[in-house]
């Protein structure tokens, strides 16, 4: 990590009266309507039970849900394995990478090998574009100056999270915050039944492209508002990218895909999203107490 470019700060959740801490992942979860797992599984069962070509052929609703759960656990493990590899490349040396490949038997794991190839190809392009690695997996926090009133109480709040990686381009003087994705796809186009996000984000479709963008913009806000970057508090100096490193090639033959933000940065909009999420958290928590 370059101490000259990044000022690490210790994030502590201090107990303060009527002060709410909320993670960015919780913020994002409040933006989407709850997933109706049982309902979707039922429709999947009805559409595929008698189809011998379907992976859900002769599967019960319970078995379908179990399949989804198992698939999610496997994807999560591969995501962790990829993060470990990225750490070896960015923070280690060639021997660290060799040891990783040996321990994970990457030669005989086609899925992990593809995740790795996707990262290697992207990182090669990134370096050729003039970007140097700064740091990775750092905790950040954004304490809003705004207050939230519910009933006769006023609340303050802090949003917390951890970004994947930060790079810097000496030629342009610009930073780049990256969020790695390794499972599923980045949905950029709505389908027939795609709804909208909730609260102030209802102007956007319920696509992960929008929620991932919101996540990255939180990191950007936290880095700048906390003065964690060298010589800049200007939002124009920090770019963000969603980088998908899946287990398969895309239609164009590329092993990875880099996505620009789904919408333009707007701090007022982000503040409204954070305030919405905090209000929702307070109200939902109060219902649990009752």
Positions of the model-derived regions?
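Charged, glycine-rich intrinsically disordered N-terminal tails and low-complexity linkers that flank
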Residues: 1-85
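Residue-level preference for long, well-ordered alpha-helices that form the structural scaffold
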Residues: 108-111, 115, 204-212
